[in-house]
Amino acid sequence: MIILPFVFRAADNGLDLAPWQPLQTREMVMATVNLEAEPGPLSVDLHKSALVIIDMQRDFLEPGGFGAALGNDVSRLRAAVVPCREVLGAARRVGMLVIHTREGHRPDLTDAPPHKVLRGDPANRIGARGPMGRILVRGEPGHDIIPELYPLPGEPVIDKPGKGAFYQTDLELMLRNRGIDTLFVCGVTTEVCVNTTVREANDRGFRCIVLSDCCASYFPEFHAAGLAMIKAQGGIFGSVAGSKPLLNSLAGVP
């Protein structure tokens, strides 16, 4: 005997039964692309892939933000903006799931560990007031994503209190619900939030492909080391690829 699942649905005379159908939240692309990467070439099912753009926030990338207040050269992070924008446009065109993340805290800082809040110069600490509002506080202008990569309506935004995008968020649930097993990862900084997120994802069974020119660091040597650690020993945490091979592959998807 076969038991078919049913759901209740609204009807003029109350409720009736309808056959259950899986929820479609986006137009799926049934396509497999081949991608040159390190440590080796990959075959990727776009139906099971998502683009995760990490922390491309004004506080990190714009003059007057948190990163600049710490004495960093924000132009080094902005080098990733154009490649990210190109990949984002291609991912949207083929219907890939796009997820954005932002690091920041509640206005009362109850979700921020004391040692994190007390780090550094008191004038530039998390929660202090800067040119773009309170530093790394949710709802402030500096906390938001830069205009060049701003999320479209319907694109999920993960607000995270830590370095990794899985810690204290519903990112894993979101990916599991959509059948995602592969993540294309972009964002900043390579050695901190990108690396932490990739390691978290790897431990949860997701395959990660880090797009090297779509990531950046205030310190070029940290960027290089972060990428090297991901692809080391046969891809211990994931793979590394440039954006151009991915763009070329996506260009062939109708």
Residues covered by each model-derived region:
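Beta-hairpin (beta-strand-turn-beta-strand) motif
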Residues: E103-G104, P161
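A short alpha/beta connector and helix-capping loop motif
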Residues: G65-A91, M96-L97
